[in-house]
UniProtKB/Swiss-Prot annotation:
It comes from the Bacteria. Coiled coil: none annotated. It is found in: Cytoplasm. Homotetramer. Dimer of dimers. Interacts specifically with the aryl carrier protein (ArCP) domain of EntB. The active site is at residue 63. GO terms for molecular function: 1,4-dihydroxy-2-naphthoyl-CoA thioesterase activity. This is Proofreading thioesterase EntH.
Length: 137
């Protein structure tokens, strides 16, 4: 297991109360040895005007996952902030739920890079993101 902080899924989800994460319906669903996973509904909260998943919602899911994964890689007195997010959208999603899977690409002392892949309910890749974070403290 790569994580330096050990929180339960309930504790991770509790951090989302009264935030954009909760408003979008994002829920952490799995914390593996080297991955963090969350789901987000595709509904009126996350649609763009044409009834499809908004690219910004996919980006918010990705940044949520990467930032929390980055936080889990810090020690007491440290935190992380996102410095760059890149998203490539591959496929439209009109309804259902999407699942984001976050894994590390680089874990340095002062910077981290995370790959977040968003899948539809059929397991098809919808979006590929990369989040860079800076470790503070």
């Amino acid at each position: 297991m790569i994580w330096k902080r050990h929180l339960s899924l309930d504790a991770l989800n509790a951090t989302s109360q009264n935030t954009l994460v909760a408003h979008l319906g994002i829920v952490y669903t799995r914390l593996g040895d080297d991955m963090l996973e969350a789901e987000m509904p595709v509904d009126a909260r996350t649609h763009q005007p044409f009834g499809l998943l908004h690219g910004g919602a996919s980006a918010a899911l990705a940044e949520t996952l990467g930032s929390m994964a980055g936080f889990l890689m810090t020690r007491d007195g440290q935190n992380v902030v996102g410095t760059e997010l890149n998203a490539t959208h591959h496929r439209a999603v009109a309804q259902g739920t999407v699942r984001g899977v976050c894994q590390p690409m680089h874990l340095g002392r002062s910077s981290q890079s995370w790959e977040i892949v968003v899948f539809d309910e059929q397991g098809r890749r919808c979006c590929t993101c990369r989040l860079s974070t800076m470790v503070l403290g």
